[in-house]
Amino acid sequence: MPIRKVSLLRLIPLASLVLAACTTTKPTGPATSPTSPQWRAHEQAVQQLSQYQTRGSFAYLSDQKKVYARFFWQQYSPDRYRLLLTNPLGSTELDLNVQKNVVQLTDNQGKRYVSDNAEEMIRKLTGMAIPLDNLRQWMLGLPGEASDFKLDDQYRLNSLTYQQGSQTWTVDYQDYNNSLKPQLPSRLELKQGDQRIKLKMDDWTLK
């Protein structure tokens, strides 16, 4: 069944956006080598996280669309996760469940759609181009498929560049949660052309 584009995401109005108004603390200090043993140890510790959840603020900004929401991400296993977007009243606007090659999305009217490609489904139904396959890694502070990346002075990801076909994505890490072991990002921004995706993670739960 072809996926028809629907009017999803009547989400948070501009006045309620907290992301733009918040100051950020970008990791600073001299760049460190991606081949350093400290980075390898941190990378391996993060890669061992197979079950976790995080929640916070989400913004998608482009010339054609602006979406603001609260998000909840739960990773059940390496190939199974859930992404939930809600409005200020707590009502579900988008509920995405992915397990291996089966993708199910429920919209704000309770309609369900099934596909085998999460990125394509999100793009067709919402108009948002979100690199979900790599975002799962980037949220954790891992480079994913990107080979061009830089570290900060604490051997964490500071920025990366990823070429996806004709598109070039850049990711800037603006803050980390230093209370976690291993330390995980608390604020990052993705850019591609006129598109920007901002994520602010309020908390992490690791299992």
UniProtKB/Swiss-Prot annotation:
Give residues with lipid attachment (N-palmitoyl cysteine).
22
Highest taxon in the source lineage: Bacteria
According to its UniProt entry, this protein's organism is Serratia proteamaculans (strain 568)
Q: Which GO terms describe its biological process?
A: lipoprotein localization to outer membrane; protein transport
Quote the protein name from its UniProt record: Outer-membrane lipoprotein LolB
State what this protein does.
Answer: Plays a critical role in the incorporation of lipoproteins in the outer membrane after they are released by the LolA protein.
- Which gene specifies this protein's sequence? lolB
- GO cellular component: a single term: cell outer membrane
Protein keywords: Cell outer membrane, Chaperone, Lipoprotein, Membrane, Palmitate, Protein transport, Signal, Transport
Lipidation (S-diacylglycerol cysteine) occurs at 22
- Please name the taxonomic classification of the source: Bacteria, Pseudomonadati, Pseudomonadota, Gammaproteobacteria, Enterobacterales
Cited Gene3D superfamilies: Lipoprotein localisation LolA/LolB/LppX
